[in-house]
């Protein structure tokens, strides 16, 4: 049993080194609050640089099983829906098996060739503010994730 758990943890850590392509379903272990931000921003920038983006959905999920201090399995889904060249949405969802969840929803609107806004809760943000707002949202959610993952990381170091 101990050997099985050790191998599972090694697999979780090694998944960080896999190459990533836009549009794939990622099973990542996020170690810091910035990790989710880096992945999602890379894909948002890809979309913003496309002249005529096609419909895409990007999902980011913490590799499972990830056990937190309360023994819960934690999962994060970040979905990017591109409806057409002018509109899209970003959704963040955080779940564990104790019933805890957190959800944030953003709309991306393209009004002119180089003008984008993100809107949420009746607030709108200009294109130049997109990365800051995304980082804020990712930080709030991934901080909760990293608190759980630190436990797994520490366990991995002790049995390595």
Give residue spans per PLM region.
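Mixed-charge, Lys/Arg-enriched low-complexity segments
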Residues: 4-31, 35, 112-160
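Intrinsically disordered, low-complexity regulatory segments enriched in Ser/Thr/Pro
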Residues: 70-139, 143
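Negatively charged, low-complexity tracts enriched in Asp/Glu with abundant Ser/Thr
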Residues: 19-77
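Generic local-structure boundary detector
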Residues: 20, 51, 59, 71, ...
């Amino acid at each position: 049993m101990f050997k099985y758990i050790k191998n599972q943890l090694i697999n979780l850590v090694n998944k960080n080194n896999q190459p990533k392509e836009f549009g794939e379903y990622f099973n990542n272990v996020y170690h810091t609050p910035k990790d989710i931000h880096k992945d999602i921003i890379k894909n948002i920038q890809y979309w913003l640089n496309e002249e005529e983006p096609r419909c895409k959905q990007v999902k980011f999920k913490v590799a499972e099983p990830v056990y937190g201090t309360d023994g819960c399995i934690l999962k994060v889904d970040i979905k990017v829906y591109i409806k057409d060249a002018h509109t899209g949405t970003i959704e963040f969802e955080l779940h564990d098996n104790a019933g805890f969840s957190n959800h944030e929803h953003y709309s991306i609107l393209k009004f002119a060739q180089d003008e984008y806004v993100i809107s949420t809760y009746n607030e709108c943000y200009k294109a130049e503010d997109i990365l800051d707002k995304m980082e804020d949202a990712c930080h709030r959610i991934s901080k909760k994730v990293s608190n759980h993952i630190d436990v797994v990381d520490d366990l991995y170091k002790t049995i390595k």
